[in-house]
From Swiss-Prot:
UniProt comment concerning the protein's domains: Avian ovomucoid consists of three homologous, tandem Kazal family inhibitory domains.
Stated name of the protein: Ovomucoid
Species annotation: Megapodius freycinet
Keyword entries, A-Z: Disulfide bond, Glycoprotein, Protease inhibitor, Repeat, Secreted, Serine protease inhibitor
Cysteines joined through disulfide linkages: 6-36, 14-33, 22-54
PROSITE patterns: KAZAL_1, KAZAL_2
């Protein structure tokens, strides 16, 4: 199981860093920050599928 620590999130703004992650919703997130913000928004239902684009 691949996991990302989102305990420091949500954050009000994310950098434009390009390190894509693929979520369990089959959506590509540009970086950990945007992914973790989405995880918080989903109340923890969103998980990491894998690193890289979906």
């Amino acid at each position: 199981l691949v996991t990302v620590d989102c305990s420091d999130y949500p954050k009000p703004s994310c950098t434009l860093e390009d390190k894509p992650l693929c979520g369990s919703d089959n959506q590509t997130y540009s970086n950990k920050c945007s992914f973790c913000n989405a995880v918080v928004d989903s109340n923890g239902t969103l998980t990491l599928s894998h690193f890289g684009k979906c």
